[in-house]
Amino acid sequence: WTSNRFFRNFGSSTISIDIIMRRRLLSLCAVLCMALVVMAEGKAKYVFYFIGDGMGVNQVNGTETYMAAVEGRIGTSPLCFAQFPYVGLVTTYSGTNGVTDSAAGGTALATGNKTKNGALGIKSDLTTRINSIAALAKSEGKAVGVTTSVSVDHATPASFYAHVKDRNMYHQIGKDLIAAGFDFYAGSDFLQPENNELSGNKDLYTQCREAGYTIARGYADYRKKAKKADKMLLLQTETANKADRTSIPYAIDRQKNDLTLQDITRAAIHFLSQKDTDGFFLMVEGGKIDWACHSNDAATAFKEVIDMDN
């Protein structure tokens, strides 16, 4: 991944990778859908990295079977990413466990390195830092966005910018988000915006603003602020936070003015496209497929898969 080799080598391919299975049907698995939009000479300019957390083969097949049933027929109705020309399966054990978790799995997705369960952006020795594909893209002059339907400091998005030994170090992860300096972040909110022991009297919102980030609350607020913003942090509204700050609502429970993964993706593409850079890298996580499966809620899981596919 040194120099510009990464962007040249992928060329015009599209990839879908089924990854990160957990025990039984309550798997923490991710299907990686990386779509590359290329320039005439074959060098990737726009890289989209879609991760469905908890989305293994069963979740994909179950959703496609459900979609066919809704259409009144037996069989399957293919999801968009399932029709990509290249599909692969990989083993998902972490550096120290047969069953991975979101932190180790996310680090593998973001950096290509296996690590200890719970660790983010560091090797199994819990000391050696490893940089992500997002950091590489930033170092090569690309605009970078990291987005999710859960909190911005959750394990999968944090794998792309943080370097901590414990995924529960949410305040430190938030500080790493700021230090990474990516152009666009989006999710429900921070889980631990305040920690006087680490940050004095400054919460993460204050630190973000001091680092040059504009904070938008909801898609309508983003549209008002985007043009004048240098860097953007898109979060859900304060009203939505009172109900649940850990994530945006499930697709099956969505209300009219709720922030959606489509809103987040649309805003990210818009914001990154207006940056004066040679293309961009964007990671989008559908983070609640896994949560629905932990609750044994098939209907909600299928709706979350469809929502990410949209």
Annotate each PLM feature.
Residues 166, 256-265, 304-308:
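Phosphate/oxyanion-binding active-site loops and adjacent basic polyanion-contact surfaces
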Residues 155-161, 239-253, 268, 276-310:
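Active-site His/acidic residue clusters
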Residues 50-51, 147, 187-188, 235-238, ...:
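Generic beta-strand/beta-sheet core signal
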Residues 41-226, 230-231, 307:
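N-terminal catalytic scaffold of extracellular/periplasmic and nuclease hydrolases
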Residues 31-39:
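Hydrophobic h-region of N-terminal signal peptides that target proteins for export
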